[in-house]
């Protein structure tokens, strides 16, 4: 079996480059286009970068809520010799529901090897989808969120799981600022 801790965002090697998407959002793509943002700050309300190859409206809505209300999320990660243990929660019912929904959908996607290829998705997540059959996942829904345990017998997969967990923690702490910083590197 396989699964995913949480959905993680950054540039996918299978999608347009971040620079191209960033320029398009800010009207720097040339020609008659004014860009989707017409010179404004990143669109924190519609978040067009959350769309993927086959993402559902529910998946995108969950991600928007998680990003827009990231300050209401509590997250703890423990690196294990063979993987990770994470706790992600919120005392805000709508945020908790988005977290649980998102984790459940991503665990299913990873088990099926069905990479959503979200525009701002992490290369780490792409790599995890490539090795999804080497990941064991257990989830436990709590009153405020979800515990996730992911393990692998492959040390390289363990490193990917730990990297992904750290990236998700950064996003839960800093929101889209973490994504934009990572994508501009």
Give, region by region, the residue ranges found by the protein language model.
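Intrinsically disordered, low-complexity terminal tails/loops enriched in metal-binding residues
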Residues: 1-185
């Amino acid at each position: 079996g396989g699964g995913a801790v949480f959905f993680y965002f950054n540039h996918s090697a299978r999608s347009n480059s971040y620079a191209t998407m960033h320029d398009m959002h800010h009207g720097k793509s040339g020609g008659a286009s004014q860009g989707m943002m017409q010179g404004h700050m990143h669109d924190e309300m519609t978040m067009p970068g959350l769309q993927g190859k086959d993402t559902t409206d529910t998946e995108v809505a969950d991600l928007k809520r998680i990003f827009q209300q990231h300050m209401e999320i509590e997250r703890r990660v423990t690196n294990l010799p063979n993987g990770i243990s994470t706790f992600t929660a919120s005392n805000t019912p709508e945020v908790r529901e988005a977290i649980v929904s998102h984790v459940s959908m991503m665990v299913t996607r990873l088990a099926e090897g069905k990479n959503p290829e979200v525009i701002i998705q992490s290369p780490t997540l792409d790599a995890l989808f490539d090795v999804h059959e080497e990941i064991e996942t257990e989830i436990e829904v709590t009153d405020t969120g979800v515990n996730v345990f992911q393990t692998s017998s492959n040390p390289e997969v363990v490193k990917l799981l730990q990297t992904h967990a750290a990236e998700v923690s950064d996003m839960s702490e800093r929101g889209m600022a973490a994504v934009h910083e990572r994508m501009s590197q």
